[in-house]
């Protein structure tokens, strides 16, 4: 409650809660429902992953192919380690621990109720018959695909879970395979959209890695490319919650892609606080290098986040008049604004700007 009071968006959320607005009620309904269902999703994920790992007679080849396909040997595991890691992860309790670690992500937890709501809204709009199995498969598949970014980021960033990075390298190809097989249950157009989005996300990841190596080469164009890792993953998931059918596929894509980029800005601010350094690459780093003023850089990052959110809101004006879950989406965007405002206010309160400036000067040499 104190966190909500600390931002204007949070106060607006509290006001809607007191008035029991339609958006608040819809959002709360899905939040409570998915909190109850999340453990079931996690269990399905663990079981599918365990089955895939134990059944693979050539894990070395699987891991090499994944690293080659992604275009990053940093994601590969030394051949001599593969069998030991497979033996460790074949223990279902150990595997469950690793899955829980990568599912312990605000990004994953924020998207689970959203995808459920979008899928239901699209099903109602198109008059689809009820298929719980298909619904679970499409939603689970996209959550798992989004979750793949967690171990990949931890491997590349090397800023948390250092003792588990080999386990994550082993798990990655199986996570992707499970996501694909589940998403395919939505039909060929859904799988095709996913593959196109995943290709774009890989480009974003590749640019991210290049900029980590040469931070001083950052510019607005390669930052926009880097943000494909948010835009493509979230936008594609939004598109496929409508099973890639217009008009909702395009509308959901716009809203979720831009909301994902907006959250990316907030995530960069949160990471700066937690890691006591400006993230490389990030919008704060880009603005700091060009203004020479770290505090101003974070102000501009917040301005950038508002531009992304304004674009996301265009999707609301595109929705069909009879779309029942528009208030849910309006409330969702309010929570996104609160998230960014909260971490920006926390940064200003702590004011680590001089320390950040020294570290940027060292990194950008």
Regions found by a protein language model. Give the residues of each.
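All-alpha prenyltransferase/terpene-synthase fold signal
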Residues: 1-365
